[in-house]
Every structure is written in structure tokens, then in C-alpha cells.
UniProtKB/Swiss-Prot annotation:
Residues in the signal sequence: none
Pfam family, one: RNase_PH_C
UniProt record, GO biological process: rRNA catabolic process; rRNA processing; tRNA processing
HAMAP family given in the database record: RNase_PH
EC number from the UniProt entry: 2.7.7.56
Organism of derivation: Pseudomonas fluorescens (strain Pf0-1)
PANTHER family (alphabetical): EXOSOME COMPLEX COMPONENT, EXOSOME COMPLEX COMPONENT RRP41
Biological function: Phosphorolytic 3'-5' exoribonuclease that plays an important role in tRNA 3'-end maturation. Removes nucleotide residues following the 3'-CCA terminus of tRNAs; can also add nucleotides to the ends of RNA molecules by using nucleoside diphosphates as substrates, but this may not be physiologically important. Probably plays a role in initiation of 16S rRNA degradation (leading to ribosome degradation) during starvation.
EC supergroup of this enzyme: transferase
Keywords (A to Z) from UniProt: Nucleotidyltransferase, RNA-binding, rRNA processing, Transferase, tRNA processing, tRNA-binding
Keyword Lipid metabolism tagged: no
GO molecular function: 3'-5'-RNA exonuclease activity; tRNA binding; tRNA nucleotidyltransferase activity
InterPro entries: ExoRNase_PH_dom1, ExoRNase_PH_dom2, ExoRNase_PH_dom2_sf, PNPase/RNase_PH_dom_sf, Ribosomal_Su5_D2-typ_SF, RNase_PH, RNase_PH_bac-type, RNase_PH_CS
Name the record gives this protein: Ribonuclease PH
Amino acid sequence: MKRPSGRAADQLRSIRITRNYTKHAEGSVLVEFGDTKVICTVSVENGVPRFLKGQGQGWLTAEYGMLPRATGERNQREASRGKQGGRTLEIQRLIGRSLRAALDMSKLGDLTLYVDCDVIQADGGTRTASITGAMVALVDALKVIKKRGGLKGGDPLKQMIGAVSVGMYQGEPVLDLDYLEDSAAETDLNVVMTSTGGFIEVQGTAEGAPFQPEELNAMLELAKKGMNEIFELQKAALAD
């Protein structure tokens, strides 16, 4: 088996995490997984949704979108269509669920964190790149809140979160699929993990033949290897 990119089966794409990418948001990152590029921002606002009022905890929610020409052909803006598509809703809910797992909301205070992930160039793995980059932006946003005198109840950050794709390509498990591989893969799996080794979400679909339990286990082991590298990259980015 030879991957189109020439990478080894267990090799990530080149990953770059650039912090403080925009000047207004409390946390902002440009994350690059190969040719996939996503701007992730975290904005802080006072108050919480109505369903949380009086409960003594904060909230985090996420939105996701793609520039019209993030892909090979221009896509119409969802705003001009008047509604978000099902894929967009699914991905932004995944991002929100994943990042909420990083926080103890009771220590956040009466604040809402808005995570915005905007894909400026797509070459596979946009949701996993979004989660990985937004996590770093979230850490920076928490630092800003603390500087402003917030987080009196302590640090709400419980653990780091990251995500990566794995799949069965030409009968072999491969890590971090780009678009060419993703479109031809027999199985595509998106894995969200914590820095302590737990799983937040595993989304898997067989496109060709059903995948077997041993193939699933092999893909999960590959995902864990990739996530260990991604957590080190997040750590290095935050150390700058």
C-alpha cells in the first residue's frame, strides 16, 4: 500500500499551530494539518443561557463553517441559503461536546465561551483539526479571563482535548487522512481523545465493506499513537 502523500501508514501530516492569530478574540489560533487550514477563535461573554441561569456554572458552545472556496469548487454560503446544513450542525455539536469535556463548568463562573471554527482551506480532517486548534485557543482564552480577575473558583481546565482521523485505506489502517485518502477509504474514523488517554467520541463509517473488530482495534491504536504526538504539539505551541 502506498499513500498518495507518500507518508507512512502511521505518519501524521505536517501540523502547525499558530497562536494569537487574530487580535480581537480572547483566544485565537490558525491550525494547519497539511493543506487543511482552520482559524479557531474563542470569545468570552458575560452571562449564560437561560437553561443554566442560577446554577452556578458557565457554558461553552461552538460554531463551524467553511469559506465558499475552501474546497476545489465554490460552495454557496450557508447564510445565503438561509439555513445551516446537516453536516455543519453535526460538526459544530461535536466540537462543542469535545471542548466541554476539557472544562469543569462550575469553576468557569457566569460566563459563556463561544468557539468559532472557520475552515479557510479544506483537504480532509477539518473537524479534527478544528477541535485540536480550538483547544489551544481555549487555553489562551482562560488565561485572559484569569488576567481580568475571573476564575476565582480555581482553574476550570481539567485536561487537554485533541482529535485525529484514521481509516482503512487499501486494506490497511492509516493515520490522519487527507481528502484523496478519505474519499477512497473503505472506513473512515474520527477519534476525539483526552490527554489522559480517554475517548470523548469515536465516529466511524464503513464506506465499502464492513470493518472487522480487529481492524477497529488497529485503527484505535493508531489514533492513540497520533494523539500522543498531537498533545505534544499542543504543549509545545502553548510553551512559546
